[in-house]
Amino acid sequence: MILYEYPFNERIRTLLRLEDLFERFAFFLAQEDPREHHVALTTLFEIAEVTGRADLKSDLMKELERQRQTLAPFRGNPGIEQNALEAVLGEIEQTLANLAQMQGKTGQHLVDNEWLASIRSRAVIPGGTCKFDLPSYYAWQQWPAEQRRQDIAKWIMPLLPLRDAAAIVLRLARESGQASKVMAMQGSYQQMLSGRSYQLMQVRVPPELRVIPEASANKYMLWVRFTMQDGDVRPRAVDIDVPFHLTLCNL
């Protein structure tokens, strides 16, 4: 099944973007070629841009604290797997402590590093990081891969508590949902939400159908419409019945 996820609010949308950026960063950092490490570095700049929101850290701390207060009363409950509960609570408490230790403006260490700031300013220009534009950066790219990797890992380190916090919040949200099998009649599906508030919608479709879900929602109803794309033309609505799995997640 192919999984599509749709956020219901700006906070989850931001966390999904962060998750995607950190996954891309980890992939390219693990590679060897200087061009791949260039992608890792420019992705680091994107992460800094997203995490630079003034309220992101406080939002994450509030949500983690809320989850801690929700889960803590289940300690000692015989109906709850205590080892799993303690693992989650320990992870939350450690991440809260790491967030609390973050000092100053998020990503300021990248701004204060003049060399990185010069690369960052050139990276937004198409072809702006050529060897004649940034000879010192080109020289750094000739260093051994492990040394470059250590440098980039050092620069991402102050942002890792935000990665860990986002991962916990998204995991708890995803685990809160229960998948149901539904059918989009002639490619369209609607469901009343009865005023319930959700954070995230997941749509899983069989890959062999080659359909693409487009989703929208408000506090009363959600819509899922399926399209299909042939080659490089614009996707078109389908008129076939589409079976899929729908999961609504709420923290």
Curated annotation (Swiss-Prot):
Is the keyword Cytoplasm assigned to this protein? yes
Q: What is the lineage of its organism?
A: Bacteria, Pseudomonadati, Pseudomonadota, Betaproteobacteria, Burkholderiales
**Family note:** Belongs to the ZapD family.
Looking at the Swiss-Prot or TrEMBL record, what is one Pfam family this protein matches?
ZapD
Give me the Gene Ontology terms describing cellular component.
cell division site; cytoplasm
Please provide the record's keywords in A-Z order. Answer: Cell cycle, Cell division, Cytoplasm, Septation
Protein name as it appears in the record: Cell division protein ZapD
Compartments in which it is found:
Cytoplasm
The signal sequence is none
Q: Record keywords: Nucleotide-binding included?
A: no
Source species of the chain? Burkholderia ambifaria (strain MC40-6)
Question: NCBIfam families recorded for this chain?
Answer: PRK05287.1-4
| Assembly and oligomerization | Interacts with FtsZ.
**What function does the entry list?**
Cell division factor that enhances FtsZ-ring assembly. Directly interacts with FtsZ and promotes bundling of FtsZ protofilaments, with a reduction in FtsZ GTPase activity.
Q: Which GO terms describe its biological process?
A: division septum assembly; FtsZ-dependent cytokinesis
